[in-house]
Amino acid sequence: MAYWVPMYPETALSHLQALERPRAIVEPVLEGFLVARMEEMAAIDRRAAALVGEILRLLAAGGKRIRPAFCYWGYRAGGGTEDATIAKAAAALELFHTFALIHDDLMDESDRRRGVPSVHVRLAEDHPGPADRAERYGRSGAILIGDLAAVLADELLLASEVPADRLLAALRRYDQMRIEVAAGQFLDVAGVARDEPSALRVAALKTGAYTVEGPLHIGAILAGASLEAMAGLSAYARPLGEAFQLRDDVLDHGEGSAPGATAATVDELLDRADAALDGPHLVPEAVAALRSLGGALRL
């Protein structure tokens, strides 16, 4: 079935609008949910509240909320119309991203995230003991806080008020996404991306899986999207996810810094993603938003 939403012509959404509309529904959900969980942790032990406090600190430091945006527009592309229905799922994906960032900073030994100290660094700074014990405390605490963010993401996704069959299907897709992220992260750590095909494969798993395709699919599933719509979103998401990772490599380290990391490759992937949105199975407003999100990546 083709959808049409006349109040939102395809040219109406800028890149910022495509990000800000989902952000407006996700931020209150995240804050309310995490404040409530911090109070629950404080009831266990006041010191345990700091676990959730660190998650809130990292969220408050910034971030584009790109994964909630793709979840939201996947929902809209699949025919969903009620923002409240998708708000918790979209917020859950930002919590999952927070988990990934905390653990990624540990693996990469990154001292800062979003302009503030990484979680393991912040915890170590607060420890009164010798440097070696402080470092161990920081790393151990960051693992636990990352794990907690993942658990809270599960809880929030499960709270989505949708028919049970859609929620079960979304949870299965969510599990698949998490497995792909773990595989991609491990391959990245193992240093297997030594040629262009390998680099694109790692990018598809590590970045595309949970940045673009996974969130789009979860949103579309919760909307009850058709198989045709799901296929169209996949055809868009896969090259776009690869473009995300390669663009970061070009910006951070220059062209040729990683296999396939060139502006021309990024543009080619973005052209493929854009062309995949030409079918009749997606809501035009969502198509406009997705085109804007992809177009903003051009170098």
Region annotations inferred by a language model:
Residues 1-299:
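All-alpha prenyltransferase/terpene-synthase fold signal
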